[in-house]
Regions:
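Phosphate-backbone recognition surface of nucleic-acid-processing proteins
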Residues: 1-95, 117, 157
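Low-complexity, acidic/Ser/Thr- and charged residue-rich accessory regions of DNA metabolism proteins
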Residues: 44-49, 81-163
Length: 163
């Protein structure tokens, strides 16, 4: 089961979409049809607008409603929603999470395999590793080296405020 998707949402999605995913070659086509894919219009290197395509689809609304329900979920999708909300705000986080849910549902219906949620802790660990990897890369580009601090019990143990 996917967190955020209740019985009513699943029924709405399946009644709109069906179970045959051969209509859409990839999940990108599926998400674009739903109106959940980013619509980046760029002219001369300048972004003009980055909204999603407006569509009248009950499945679109069901995915957005499911994404909103993930705000307090202790799953990887809930952690993703909270991460995006902190970076970009609630409206963008809602659409991004709905887009992710749509890709998961597409993959489930296409491959007929269940979804396995790794959990919020796994997502947070992945984000922490990504942050550390980027920090090391940036330090290397600046000609610096990262030195891990030994586990200290207090600030005085670090010798920063030596008297």
């Amino acid at each position: 089961a996917i967190d955020g998707l209740n019985v009513l949402n699943v029924q709405t999605i399946l009644s709109e979409v069906g179970t045959d995913m051969s209509k859409w070659p990839t999940s990108k086509h599926f998400c674009a049809w739903l109106g959940l894919a980013p619509n980046n219009e760029i002219s001369g290197g300048k972004p003009l607008r980055t909204d999603t395509k407006p569509v009248k689809s009950r499945a679109n609304l069901a995915f957005r409603q499911a994404a909103q329900a993930l705000a307090n979920s202790k799953s990887a999708l809930g952690a993703y929603y909270r991460h995006m909300r902190a970076r970009f705000g609630p409206p963008v986080a809602n659409v991004a999470t709905a887009h992710k849910l749509a890709r998961i549902v597409y993959a489930m219906l296409k491959t007929r395999e269940p979804y396995h949620d790794p959990g919020a802790d796994a997502y947070d660990a992945q984000q922490q590793a990504k942050l550390l990897r980027n920090l090391k890369r940036n330090a290397r580009q600046l000609g610096l080296a990262l030195v891990p601090l030994p586990p200290a019990t207090s600030v005085a143990d670090l010798g920063v405020f030596a008297t």
